[in-house]
Amino acid sequence: MNTNKIGVLLANLGTPDEPTTPAVKRYLKQFLSDPRVIDLPKFKWQFILNYMILPKRSPKVAKLYREIWTEQGSPLLAISRQQQQALQDYFNRQNQNVLVELGMSYGNPSIESATDRLIKAGVSKIIVLPLYPQYSSTTTASVLDAFARGLTQQRNIVPFEFIHSYHNDPLYIQALANTIQLAEDEKLLFSFHGIPKRYQTEGDFYPEHCQQTAQLVADKLSLTDEQWLVTYQSRFGDEEWLQPYTDETLETLPSQGVKKIAVICAGFSADCLETLEEIAEENKENFLNAGGQSYRYIPALNANTDHINALAKLIEAKI
């Protein structure tokens, strides 16, 4: 063990290996089998998942992935690799003995394999950074579960730090604010990934984190309450999710006199299917068809310099 080497595990949700129906089916099965995501009784849910949902959704989702796939592969994985390399370069420039690895909760590279690589490299400590600014049991906690699984085969468990959330981190808030320049009469919509309403009732404080992030960004930009709002996207199934829903809101705003909209997905650290297809394309079409005049998607922070600096400072605080 190198007593001076620090390991950093960047963690995100994951992506299929390729935009094909079999690959997407494997990915969705792993994702939707996580009880942190869907907490229905296992036998009942697995029957529904395997015989009703996967056969129907896999080809549809594969088609959507093909529309956003690039020469570098999945946008989420490509951008996550850029973030990993940018952070590694940052610590190298600072002459800090830090090794940055990337792991995904679902798909490849897995969190378990990333954990194993760090331990085999002889790190004396691991800092786990889930790339979810706002804590949720459906995302952040799943990272901790996977990291713990990665330690099960280790005789010696190295010390570790787990960054719980950074929804109100000043550098993260500033990085978001720096990407936003509202035009005249343009309203800002913060679209966060939704979770079932029941999860909030049971103690998940994700919506409070989302609201705090949006409020801090709005304050940084000196926006009035009428200039911005928070909605939730990507609901799944028949259960009630956090509201207001992004799609329904965008379809009704034009009739309320809001003709120009800028949408930012502040909870997504990297652009992915939910931002590039659902928000940048599908919801844009719905808003314009409902009478909107201008719809602008503000890209995720991805690997931009402000974002990398914010993440680096979060890590440095734990070294």
UniProtKB/Swiss-Prot annotation:
Q: What EC number is given for this enzyme?
A: 4.98.1.1
Catalytic activity as recorded in UniProt: heme b + 2 H(+) = protoporphyrin IX + Fe(2+)
Q: What metabolic or biological pathway is this protein involved in?
A: Porphyrin-containing compound metabolism; protoheme biosynthesis; protoheme from protoporphyrin-IX: step 1/1
Q: Give a GO molecular function annotation for the protein.
A: metal ion binding
Keyword entries, A-Z: Cytoplasm, Heme biosynthesis, Iron, Lyase, Metal-binding, Porphyrin biosynthesis
Q: What is the protein's major site of localization? A: cytoplasm
Question: Where in the cell?
Answer: Cytoplasm
Question: Per its UniProt record, what SUPFAM superfamilies does this chain match?
Answer: Chelatase
* Cellular component aspect of the GO annotation: cytoplasm
**What GO biological process terms does the UniProt entry carry, in alphabetical order?**
heme biosynthetic process
Q: Tell me one Pfam family matched here.
A: Ferrochelatase
Q: Which InterPro entries match?
A: Ferrochelatase, Ferrochelatase_AS, Ferrochelatase_C, Ferrochelatase_N
Annotated Fe cation binding lies at H193, E274
State the family it belongs to.
Belongs to the ferrochelatase family.
Described purpose of this protein according to its UniProt entry: Catalyzes the ferrous insertion into protoporphyrin IX.
Which PANTHER family does the record cross-reference, listed alphabetically? FERROCHELATASE, FERROCHELATASE, MITOCHONDRIAL
Q: What is this protein called?
A: Ferrochelatase
Origin species, per record, is Actinobacillus pleuropneumoniae serotype 7 (strain AP76)
